[in-house]
Amino acid sequence: MTTEQIYIHNYRVIEKMGKGAFSTVFKGLHRVSQKTVALKVSREKQTHETKILAYLNREFVDGVPTLLWYGRFGDNTCIATTFYEATLQNYVESIWSTNFDPCLKVLGICVQLITIMDNMHSAFIVHSDIKPDNFMVDSGGHVVAIDFGLSSLYYNVEKDVYKENKQCEHLIGSPKFASYNLHVGNSISPRDDMMSLGYMMLSLFHIQIPWSNMQEVESDLPLYDIRHPSNIKRAELKRDLREYLRVTYVDKYLVPYFEQVSSLEFKERPDYKSYREIFSTLY
């Protein structure tokens, strides 16, 4: 049976778009409306991600996909969402290769990314897995966050209670983009999405991330354990990042951005307006 003969609910599978550790994403087509969708198929239950995305949709949060369907497919669970053709990384690379003033375009993308975080955090959700793979771009050039499997509520509105900052021994999300605060044992909060976003922005501006080419050190500890030798080294480099940027790049945008987000307390609301202004100022 070819891929195009497979149906998941009302969606015909067109082609495989990508595969992760726990799921595979396909491009699909609704059998009646012919609307193109993204189909995420996983052997793991996706109820948590589905609930997060449904909640964000109910809260009318801009910058996230629309959840179109959720259900079973054989032994797998599946969700159908809005389809986006371009990954953020590919979109940015095309900007650098084809635009007369690519930096100006990338600055605009940074403003969009900050606004998406503002929108999500205003709904009391932390994304928790900020990295280039988890952002797409629609046909109009609008950036969208995806993959909410690690996302969580950081504030209980009904009880008016902020999540406790408990000592944690494991990183959440990619070690490469995990916030420095997580490396030193803090729980995740909005400040950490903003810190991880800054690390990601380095790559968007083609700035070398100091820890990106690190060789993983062999250890009996899990890779996500903050005591893993590789994570201890990453923590040191992330701690010294601002000085690295000052000396190496004399960066006008990311140095002041990191200065602001690095000073945030666990429960402190990030100053999204101020961050947007940093990247809205022309060089």
List each language-model region with its residue ranges.
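ATP-binding glycine-rich loop module of kinase domains
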Residues: 22-48
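Activation segment/activation loop of eukaryotic-type protein kinase catalytic domains
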Residues: 138-172
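Activation segment signature within eukaryotic-like protein kinase domains
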Residues: 109-110
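Protein kinase subdomain VIII
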Residues: 159, 170-186
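Conserved C-lobe activation region of Hanks-type protein kinase-like domains
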Residues: 182-247
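Short beta-strand micro-motifs within the conserved protein kinase catalytic domain, predominantly
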Residues: 66-77, 85
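Structural motif in protein kinase domains
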Residues: 84-95
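Catalytic-loop of the protein kinase fold
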Residues: 121-138
